[in-house]
């Protein structure tokens, strides 16, 4: 919007209005929370929708879900670039909210208009082959999913950075607010996910798919209204142009001066610009020293081409911070694989288990089993933030109790444990099922609880890490690295499912078949556990060598 105003990096310039902190949060978080109600509620039960209503087999449904999930998680990196470079965070969130609303409308129509999906299976067809979906029906379905992905790219890339803009990090209250924000942010998402995984799923499975899709669609509309209502409370930060131009400038300048040598009394390029005033407060670090040469002022740095021959200390240290988080980002991709499997194959397991709630005749919707994980998050996160952190701080004398990467590392251990327990439970379930006995679905509880702990530590930790360890003018991009990692993990998961299915089938029996009772899903889980263990060793090595940066204090 035109009323987005810039914030400078020094005391010489001020924000248009004083940051109001938590007063602005209900409107920003409320918007994204309702957005996740739509996407998470949809993803949790969408496999059932495609199998029952579009007559897809399990492999087709899993492949489509993983592909859509990957696109949805990749979209925020595009939204972040557009936001940080051109449109600003608020405008990007508004655009994303509108696209998401349109996507939900399309999917709602697919459930209400019979011609937009295949006809129901008849009694004779159930034992044979049901009428498949047509290409036109598939295109309508995919268009709705695409709009959802576009909307997600605008909302998720900017909600957290836009929220952090509302805290004044120059005050103790503002710093404490921004630190605790991440836990409460994830807690609100968990509560809404509980609603989507219980109420919405119940409506979809027992009343109507149309009503089940219409509920989050209506909520998305109110989320957009809520975002506009809160405009009087927001602080707007003006984008500074292409955020990657500074990166390329440093690389070009460092290459051109690769033969230069540092000597005593050397000149540094330190212009006192409003957008870069803090650069004269920094010193060059010895990390990635080959980039330091970009700051040297040479005799042939004429005014005409100086822009691409000289860089500030600020620009050089910013690109160093980006390079230094790449190994952590890479390790997170493998770490997400365990979560991917819990979101796909757990539903397949539940469909083959006893879904009856103990002591009642109520049948639990298969996709609702992940509610156990959400309950664990909803209980543990507030307890951790309000009680446990204070005690840990007294012991470690460190703000937050433990470092961000220590938190991520603890979560990775839970991820490995999740896959090991999942393999043990699946082996027992399959053995009983082959003997005509259905295991209670509540045997999936241990792995769901462990996955909840993984999200509490790793997902929350990575969200804070990627937002606080990048330059402030690149926060949207930093925040989107989490979703980029999830996207790449989804693609990797799809590729692994295909490769494992193809390779193991050569031996006569594939680990992953349409009939889970004839599969060896437990072996696949153990394979993911082994990969996660190797990944944890790599992460530990990288984390030990990482140097933290405090951009709030620099600003």
From Swiss-Prot:
Name its cellular compartments: Membrane
Q: What is its main location?
A: membrane
Q: Which InterPro entries match?
A: MFS_trans_sf, POT_fam
Spell out where the chain crosses the membrane.
62-82, 93-113, 135-155, 181-201, 209-229, 234-254, 319-339, 363-383, 405-425, 441-461, 480-500, 523-543
Instruction: Give the bilayer topology.
Output: Multi-pass membrane protein
Superkingdom is Eukaryota
Tissue specificity statement from the Swiss-Prot or TrEMBL entry: Not detected.
Q: What is this protein called?
A: Putative protein NRT1/ PTR FAMILY 2.14
Q: Which Pfam families match?
A: PTR2 (PF00854)
SUPFAM superfamilies per UniProt: MFS general substrate transporter (SSF103473)
Q: Which family does it belong to?
A: Belongs to the major facilitator superfamily. Proton-dependent oligopeptide transporter (POT/PTR) (TC 2.A.17) family.
Question: What is the organism field in this record?
Answer: Arabidopsis thaliana (Mouse-ear cress)
Q: Does the keyword Transmembrane apply?
A: yes
> From the Swiss-Prot or TrEMBL record, what is one GO molecular function term?
transmembrane transporter activity
Alphabetically sorted, this entry's keywords are:
Membrane, Transmembrane, Transmembrane helix, Transport
GO CC annotation: membrane
């Amino acid at each position: 919007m035109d009323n987005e105003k810039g914030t400078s990096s020094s005391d010489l310039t001020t924000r248009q209005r004083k940051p109001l902190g938590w007063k602005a949060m209900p409107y920003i978080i409320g918007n994204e929370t309702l957005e996740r109600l739509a996407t998470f509620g949809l993803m949790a039960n969408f496999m059932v929708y495609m199998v029952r209503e579009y007559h897809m087999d399990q492999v087709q449904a899993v492949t489509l879900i993983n592909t859509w999930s990957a696109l949805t998680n990749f979209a925020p990196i595009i939204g972040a670039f557009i936001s940080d470079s051109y449109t600003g965070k608020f405008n990007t969130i508004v655009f994303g909210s509108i696209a998401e609303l349109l996507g939900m409308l399309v999917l709602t129509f697919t459930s209400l208009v019979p011609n937009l999906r295949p006809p129901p299976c008849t009694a004779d067809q159930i034992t044979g082959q049901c009428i498949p979906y047509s290409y036109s029906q598939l295109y309508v379905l995919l268009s709705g999913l695409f709009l959802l992905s576009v909307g997600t790219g605008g909302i998720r890339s900017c909600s957290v950075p836009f929220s952090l803009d509302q805290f004044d990090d120059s005050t103790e209250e503002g710093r404490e607010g921004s630190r605790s924000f991440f836990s409460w942010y994830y807690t609100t998402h968990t509560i809404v996910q509980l609603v989507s995984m219980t109420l919405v799923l119940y409506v979809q499975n027992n009343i109507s798919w149309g009503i089940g899709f219409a509920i989050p669609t209506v909520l998305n509309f109110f989320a957009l209204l809520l975002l506009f209502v809160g405009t009087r409370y927001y602080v707007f930060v003006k984008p500074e142009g292409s955020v990657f131009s500074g990166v390329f400038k440093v690389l070009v300048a460092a290459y051109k001066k690769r033969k230069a040598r540092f000597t005593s009394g050397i000149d540094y390029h330190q212009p006192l610009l409003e957008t870069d005033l803090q650069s004269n407060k920094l010193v060059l670090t010895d990390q990635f020293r080959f980039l330091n040469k970009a700051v040297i002022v040479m005799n042939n740095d004429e005014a005409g081409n100086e822009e691409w021959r000289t860089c500030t200390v600020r620009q050089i240290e910013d690109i160093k911070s980006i390079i230094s988080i790449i190994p952590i980002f890479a390790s997170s991709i493998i770490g997400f694989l365990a979560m991917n499997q819990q979101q796909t194959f757990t539903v397949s397991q539940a469909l083959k288990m006893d879904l009856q709630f103990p002591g009642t005749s109520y049948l639990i919707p298969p996709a609702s089993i992940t509610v156990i994980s959400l309950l664990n998050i909803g209980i543990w996160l507030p307890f951790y933030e309000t009680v446990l952190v204070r005690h840990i701080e007294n012991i470690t004398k460190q703000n937050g109790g433990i470092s961000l990467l220590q938190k991520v590392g603890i979560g990775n251990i839970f991820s490995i444990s999740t896959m090991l327990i999942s393999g043990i439970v699946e082996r027992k379930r399959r053995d009983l099922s082959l003997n005509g006995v259905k295991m209670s679905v509540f045997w999936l509880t241990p792995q769901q609880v462990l996955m909840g702990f993984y999200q509490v530590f790793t997902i929350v930790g990575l969200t804070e890490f990627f937002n606080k360890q990048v330059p402030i003018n690149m926060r949207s991009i930093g925040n989107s690295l989490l979703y980029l990692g999830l996207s790449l993990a989804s693609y990797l998961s799809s590729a692994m499912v295909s490769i494992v299915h193809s390779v193991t089938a050569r031996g006569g029996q594939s680990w992953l078949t349409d009939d889970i009772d004839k599969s060896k899903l437990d072996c696949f889980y153990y394979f993911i556990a082994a990969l996660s263990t190797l990944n944890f060793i790599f992460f530990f090595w990288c984390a030990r060598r990482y140097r933290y940066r405090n951009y709030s204090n620099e600003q």
